[in-house]
């Protein structure tokens, strides 16, 4: 997805430090950032925020973190948080490679990866969010019962991710090869998921855990 540059977005985000972390000011202090101490769930690459804001509204007993590096998109998540009055959702504007700078070991209960960039060229494999270096970060910050939820329309990325996770020592608790045909009604659509689904694209989904989180 090509993101149109918004020169004003950085200043707009900086005007809301209570909701947006742009400079690592809350690194290592995620729990203290929220009004209540509750389980923490993260979505990495939140896009415009439809998925994460819907989750936060439905589950006030869980604290959510939206992690998105594109400032020109993050402002849309911020607008939704403000409009919906969500107190259990915060935003980190940074790259996922910095995860362990923000979260303590075992601090997170769930990670969502929705429609991540597939980086189809082999030479770019290390940029995929299911590459082993990212899996190592997830393992570090997830608690013993924590899990990873992954969703994509890209069959190649899904196959790669299944293999990458298996080789890393993860196991799968759920695999859907055609999510919308098998959906039990609990699925929350992202903006892109609706677009892909309307075009007839198949949606793939999995839930996975580490055999040993530490």
From Swiss-Prot:
UniProt keyword annotation of Methyltransferase present: yes
Residues that bind substrate: 121, 153, 190-193
Keywords from the UniProt entry: Methyltransferase, S-adenosyl-L-methionine, Transferase, tRNA processing
GO MF term set: tRNA (guanine(46)-N7)-methyltransferase activity
GO cellular component: tRNA methyltransferase complex
InterPro entries in UniProt: SAM-dependent_MTases_sf (IPR029063), tRNA_(Gua-N-7)_MeTrfase_Trmb (IPR003358), tRNA_methyltr_TrmB_bact (IPR055361)
Protein's pathway: tRNA modification; N(7)-methylguanine-tRNA biosynthesis
Active-site residues, Swiss-Prot/TrEMBL: 117
Biological function: Catalyzes the formation of N(7)-methylguanine at position 46 (m7G46) in tRNA.
Known EC number: 2.1.1.33
Family annotation (PROSITE patterns): SAM_MT_TRMB (PS51625)
Protein family (similarity comment): Belongs to the class I-like SAM-binding methyltransferase superfamily. TrmB family.
The keyword tRNA processing is annotated on this UniProt entry: yes
Reaction equations catalysed: guanosine(46) in tRNA + S-adenosyl-L-methionine = N(7)-methylguanosine(46) in tRNA + S-adenosyl-L-homocysteine
A family per Pfam: Methyltransf_4
Binding site for S-adenosyl-L-methionine: 43, 68, 95, 117
Protein name in UniProt: tRNA (guanine-N(7)-)-methyltransferase
